[in-house]
């Protein structure tokens, strides 16, 4: 009887093994660059063509290989980095399995050119589909150059899963970003289709992070330095305002190796838990140094996940390290503002004097002033310079007193008096006007006619709760409306209608804004320019990863569109062949709608509530916001009385 189990041929096992190691061009670049760093290279140049499908070339200035070593490097499980079982648990290198080069060679046409410092000439090896075709001598500098051409030429099924050249190039750029941040002392150059995407010179960590993630983030980075026993945590953490909608900017490293470990990421998120909104992620570059025997990095094919011997201790150390920095950073050092009662005219006048730097006298009882009748110029008395002793805390406190007072118009002098007084010598003009009346609470609007009004407009407004919920009455029912969710639903339906027509209404910016993106974000933006234009965003490439933002959706406020754009790029970057733009367009419109309305607490006037209810009546309204949260809840009189045990 014939056996059903058989030994697979070598060429097939090589392809299976390559499937674990070589997922896309970025996987090839990762293996080759890590080998270059392990070889002690101080400069790495990565070049790709057609997103890496046509060419991936990595050049380094490392120690190089002899002829015999170069030939052995193409054999499976051949490595110079470990020799015994003990070595496997005391790793100090990025690679150790001896699988990278043979796996890459089995699915490409590969050329290795290498030379050591004690050799006069180098060695060049050409392999195709995992088989060595040619070995010869060559002239070159010390180091190694590996060229990978026609990736997946013999595995067409895998080739079908590759995405566009822009997307694959973005993944290579993101991979190099991770490695460049981990080794700021090494120079990195990345070229895509002959164009230099970035060149990172050797620098300190902060300069390297700014180079890779954008200069705009540099002023928001704070250093981490923490040690507990044999565990050390260092790096940089960014202010909460730099947060992202996904964890793509969590750059975490164990002994110099980039990882995506759940324990490490959870510790960082716990440290930020009181600083970020739900669903937001910080920007960090955190390095953990621990004895190699305390961590196992050989638990995942990509080595992105690790296993700690003392998981709880590592988690707490990372959380404490990040928390200790966040507790000392400027966004917590704000002067406390004491609660004040409703300000009076006297309070407001005193507050204005403080905000003017104490250069003007505090208000006194108004005295009548004779009218100006002379045609002669009016000389102004010399202002006496005074040293202001008003602290910033005092300024912050009294600003609150001005909240209910509108600035009064300042009447100008008649023309014959204007030429004789200069701005440098004149005291501030303070006309003796009648006291500014304190704004009284608005009276309730008249009850709308239920027959003429829609459902929401017919509600009787009781007031607001916690500056977040509108309390209304309809008959004997108590209706509670989440004002943010309601605003969001209205904005979403408006955007959806515009998008269905052709595109979202865009507002051109008077002064285009310069925006810096990461390499992956820039690649996503370049690929989806047309879709972003339909959403109302107008971009123009400015060079490298810098873009000019020239237009935004009309519904977005001036302070929200930067965060919105980064969130949308994060969403677009997650698209795959099975998930097209049309599948997420409503999610993107919902995100724009969410960013276009006021978040948090806000006191609404009766006029604003009436306008909101009118918009809700005119909208094809749903009982939930675009994210699924309810817009309103209704309590019947019976339910309320049951709460108070009346029935």
From Swiss-Prot:
Task: Please give the InterPro entries that the UniProt record associates with this protein.
Answer: DNA_mismatch_repair_CS, DNA_mismatch_repair_MutL, DNA_mismatch_S5_2-like, HATPase_C_sf, MutL/Mlh/PMS, MutL/Mlh/Pms-like, MutL_C, MutL_C_dimsub
Name the Gene Ontology molecular function terms of this record: ATP binding; ATP hydrolysis activity; ATP-dependent DNA damage sensor activity; mismatched DNA binding
Domain of life, per the record? Bacteria
Please list the residue ranges that the record marks as compositionally biased, kind Polar residues: 413-423
Q: Which UniProt keywords apply?
A: DNA damage, DNA repair
An example GO CC term for this entry is: mismatch repair complex
The keyword Cytoplasm is assigned to this record? no
Which Pfam family would be a valid example here? DNA_mis_repair
Which SUPFAM superfamilies would you find in this protein's record?
ATPase domain of HSP90 chaperone/DNA topoisomerase II/histidine kinase, DNA mismatch repair protein MutL, Ribosomal protein S5 domain 2-like
Q: What biological processes does GO assign it?
A: mismatch repair
The region called Disordered is annotated at: 356-391, 407-428
Q: According to its UniProt entry, what is the function of this protein?
A: This protein is involved in the repair of mismatches in DNA. It is required for dam-dependent methyl-directed DNA mismatch repair. May act as a 'molecular matchmaker', a protein that promotes the formation of a stable complex between two or more DNA-binding proteins in an ATP-dependent manner without itself being part of a final effector complex.
Q: Which family does it belong to?
A: Belongs to the DNA mismatch repair MutL/HexB family.
Name of the protein described by the UniProt record: DNA mismatch repair protein MutL
Query: Which gene is the coding source of this polypeptide chain?
Result: mutL
